[in-house]
Amino acid sequence: MIKSELVQIVAARNPHLYHRDVENIVNAVLDEITDALAAGNRVELRGFGAFSVKNRPSRSGRNPRTGESVFVEEKWVPFFKTGKELRERLNPGMGDEEDD
């Protein structure tokens, strides 16, 4: 699913809202999540998951074409940890324990 499809689905579920308003809301939510992560904050959507950033330290890497050793600089990367409800919905029955 891409962002425009998400906007269409949300707009269809909420016919009282204009398509443009739904698009603005989706963009605002994504902008707020992005701004929070850029500030180093964690964003938790209970039941769905949590977004955070993790530091990847600098290291020595290798160019796959030439085999030449290269220096890879330190960087921050986004990380997503799934929430319990999302995991359970993706894997129904996995958390159920049966007594025999």
UniProtKB/Swiss-Prot annotation:
Instruction: Enumerate the Gene3D superfamilies for this protein.
Output: IHF-like DNA-binding proteins
GO cellular component annotations of the record:
chromosome; cytosol
Q: Which UniProt keywords apply?
A: DNA recombination, DNA-binding, Transcription, Transcription regulation, Translation regulation
Where would one find the signal peptide in this protein? none
- Has the keyword Iron been applied to this entry? no
Alphabetical GO biological process terms: DNA recombination; regulation of DNA-templated transcription; regulation of translation
A molecular function (GO) term: DNA binding
Protein name (Swiss-Prot/TrEMBL)? Integration host factor subunit beta
Q: How does it assemble?
A: Heterodimer of an alpha and a beta chain.
Q: Which NCBIfam families match?
A: hip (TIGR00988), PRK00199.1 (NF001222)
